[in-house]
């Protein structure tokens, strides 16, 4: 609600505001959210449409905040985000227990890239629940537990913590589904306290590999290492 943000930033003394909250879940239809595991490419594409909408939401709320807080003293806090699907069959619908697949890994990586690229205003973002609920990093069953694809994305992205955002220009192919399209690649970059540059790339296209060329400026680089999180199908899970 952009009007809500406008009124809050205009009428409440900023000395009383540490942050303004933004919630956004990647839900296709609140009445029929779709399965967490056995989903179609259409479900995947629509989920990613909703996920990438995060960039527009942050941009528009940030523009309003910039009018009243050009010094960016008040943070935009995205304290609820992630994929939200139908619960696993046989589980309590009130517990929101859902499986976590490679779709969720891609959603998480693309969303974290958006947060990184808006880090001048987004200074906190978190999953509302981390275990057994929605975009969980850990799933448990009695004494058993597993780490989800989302966990592995979070672990890979922790190199960006306490680092400095590096601006980037991204030219990408389109991921086309029917008559609609999304950018095929999502990216963000940072330099850590040791002077190492970290670049995170996400291939959103469910059908095609992406060849990526990276031009680095303003530094001397002597070696490169990389890690890839991948699986055969979007529906794969632990």
Residue ranges and their predicted role:
Residues 61:
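Active-site-proximal structural segments of metal-dependent nucleotidyl cyclase/transferase enzymes
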Residues 2-11, 214:
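Distinct, well-ordered alpha-helical segments
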Residues 220-238:
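Acidic, Ser/Thr/Pro-rich beta/coil linker or hinge segments at domain junctions
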Residues 1-4, 26-32, 82-88, 131-137, ...:
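Flexible loop/turn segments at secondary-structure boundaries
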Residues 24, 73-187, 193-196:
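Aromatic/acidic polysaccharide-binding cleft in carbohydrate-active enzymes
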């Amino acid at each position: 609600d952009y009007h809500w943000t406008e009124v809050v930033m205009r009428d409440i003394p900023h000395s009383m505001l540490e942050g303004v909250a933004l919630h956004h879940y990647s839900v296709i239809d609140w009445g029929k959210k779709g399965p967490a595991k056995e989903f179609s490419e259409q479900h995947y594409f629509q989920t990613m449409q909703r996920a990438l909408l995060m960039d527009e939401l942050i941009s528009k709320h940030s523009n309003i905040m910039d009018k009243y807080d050009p010094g960016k003293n008040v943070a935009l806090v995205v304290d609820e985000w992630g994929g939200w699907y139908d619960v696993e069959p046989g589980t309590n619908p009130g517990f929101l227990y859902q499986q976590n697949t490679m779709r969720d890994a891609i959603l998480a990586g693309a969303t974290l890239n958006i947060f990184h690229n808006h880090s001048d205003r987004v200074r906190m973002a978190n999953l509302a629940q981390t275990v057994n609920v929605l975009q969980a990093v850990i799933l448990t069953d009695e004494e058993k537990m597993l780490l989800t694809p989302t966990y592995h994305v979070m672990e890979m992205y922790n190199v960006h913590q306490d680092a400095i955002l590096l601006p980037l220009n991204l030219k990408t192919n389109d991921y086309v589904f029917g008559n609609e399209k999304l950018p095929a690649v999502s990216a963000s970059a940072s330099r850590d306290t040791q002077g190492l540059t970290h670049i995170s790339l996400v291939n959103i296209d469910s059908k095609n590999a992406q060849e990526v060329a990276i031009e680095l400026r303003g530094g001397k680089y002597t070696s490169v290492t990389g890690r890839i999180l991948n699986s055969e199908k979007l529906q794969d899970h632990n």
